[in-house]
């Protein structure tokens, strides 16, 4: 492997480059960009059925899930059935903007290579005449899959929502090519106490010890986010519980709720129906107000059908997230073949609608992740599925430890830096040079601090990390880095994925995504980082998956063979690269 050392002082005046069964909300409004993800799906009636003459390949991902062309959004109803993984997803078969939505359907035996099938669900009945929105899959006894999804029974402006089900036409077909929507739909309608225009996203159902099936539906009342609970003995006749399983003031519409158990010990996942003293439960909601996903770990009181979050994290906007970047509308499922819980999440584009139409596609599914509970019991851990490693190609590694003093860049050569997987561990000798954490920053979120203290702002312990998708002269780059602050009687570790200098292209949304990492550096003085780099997306996992950040970026110079990868340090404390392994990533043999 070749190594290039550049002595760079990241000062703002020093270099030229430093000067530059999940429902979808149907709202016809001007697009609001909140934290980089559209707050409402932008409705372009004149573009919904405009197909691309030529699908442009620049910025298309090499190993992420996406169809050949057109728009995709929420992952729907993921499941494992008779040796086959299924992923349904919201898809516009006619264009690269939101509209004409159907449940597209792809199958795989390894979660890497995907074969597209005909759409499984599309508007065709009175109970979904105006739309088939997101939902979940449940495996009933006897290995019988059923899909719960939201149907739209009145068009704009009301968009009245009901909950429907669909069943396979042929259970002997492992690909489940054809689905039937029985005429006894809808199963659940909003009553007088519920908001029928904000009533969607049925979860995977679970079976309690009394023999009742239970599911959640997301909603809101004024600004209070709500997860309503429904019970059924036969999966057909559903009764609303007297109270929601959980709600929270000032959180707005709870989209895409997900509710599942996690084991207190070990990495194994659990079937959704598991309860008992050896498990905690996770409630995840996607907040329409912020377009981020939040979760809590807590206790499910089965006798009262109440969920009580632990007091180890905030229950609301300032709470834990699966991902602190471009990640939304997620859905998990239990994979019995490997006893794991797998998370799917959608990343939309940060480019303009005009560019989406011109290139002929929009949206990707991020790499599936395995979820488990951290030994502390306070948060989840996430890691890319092990199957991803089958795509690793040529490998480079540092043959020895590499010390990085302030301003040093070390280039990682010998791989395709535009399409790579890199794992690195950083260490340092002392925390003495930590910068003080300004008390007024407590009023800010992590993104604000990252925008103030970016990779070019010299610090004490950090910033240090990776420069991904970098051009040769560093006119473009996307840094993923850590910065350690001294807080009262402790330290705070900030992790950033900063798209500010990711592209010279005008009109892009270039956020400074960030989150804090709950890790004790006082004793070990080490922290790890893994980044999956794929042309227009960088997925990063800090501290073995404690904090995750995904960014969509669109370099103009750092594309294909012109992309570079570096490790860097811009803090006064010398940082040591303990080890670094990087791989070129191959394309799957089949991607839709």
UniProtKB/Swiss-Prot annotation:
It catalyses: Hydrolysis of terminal non-reducing beta-D-fructofuranoside residues in beta-D-fructofuranosides. Keywords: Cell wall, Glycoprotein, Glycosidase, Hydrolase, Secreted, Signal, Zymogen. GO terms for biological process: carbohydrate metabolic process. Belongs to the glycosyl hydrolase 32 family. InterPro entries: ConA-like_dom_sf, Fructan_Metab_Enzymes, Glyco_hydro_32, Glyco_hydro_32_AS, Glyco_hydro_32_C, Glyco_hydro_32_N, Glyco_hydro_beta-prop_sf. Induction: By wounding and bacterial infection. In leaves and roots of young plants. This is Beta-fructofuranosidase, insoluble isoenzyme 1. It is found in: Secreted, Cell wall. GO terms for cellular component: extracellular region. Residues 1-39 form the signal peptide. The gene is INV1. Residues 40-48 form a propeptide. It comes from the Eukaryota. It comes from Daucus carota (Wild carrot). Gene3D superfamilies: Exo-inulinase, domain 1, Glycosyl hydrolase domain, family 43. May play an important role in phloem unloading and in stress response. Its EC number is 3.2.1.26. It is an enzyme of class 3 (hydrolase). The keyword Phosphoprotein does not apply. The keyword Hydrolase applies. Glycans are attached at residues 170, 195, 311, 348, 570. GO terms for molecular function: beta-fructofuranosidase activity.
